[in-house]
Amino acid sequence: MMTLIIPRKEAPVSGEGTVVIPQPAGDEPVIKNTFFFPDIDPKRVRERMRLEQTVAPARLREAIKSGMAETNAELYEYREQKIAAGFTRLADVPADDIDGESIKVFYYERAVCAMATASLYERYRGVDASAKGDKKADSIDSTIDELWRDMRWAVARIQGKPRCIVSQI
């Protein structure tokens, strides 16, 4: 996918007036995970989260690795239980398949994608003191909150736990 940005007619044009964000170079290797959890392909993360080439490969890789490490930590006890039950990989744990993929693997990748993207968005917020900038920051904050929620829900789904716990005081 290539993104082409063409300025509005009334906007001042400098140089050629067109900015082209090129396609990914295709040289982003898959990130190897621990023995139990699936490897993560940065290209799939870019596609799922619509990041295109607006994020440098090194930054995306760091965010994904952080997302993998944190998700793995969240699922440590779950992993130990499944290993004790005789499963060597998350993909081997009994679960429904959707589109040929274990739903547990799908939710794992969703958790990593959401966490990596939330982390990137938190660090890429623009600085704009105008009212328009405040509105954009509020929108980004809302998106970040939704991504963190998606991560928590995906982890809960892997563990077979409810997405939220409500108690009466």
Swiss-Prot record:
Q: Which InterPro entries match?
A: Phage_head_completion_GpL
Q: Which GO terms describe its biological process?
A: viral capsid assembly
Q: What does this protein do?
A: Carries out the completion of filled heads by rendering the newly packaged DNA in filled heads resistant to DNase. The protein is assumed to bind to DNA-filled capsids.
So what family is this one in? To phage HP1 protein ORF20.
Q: What is this protein called?
A: Head completion/stabilization protein
Q: Which organism is it from?
A: Escherichia phage P2 (Bacteriophage P2)
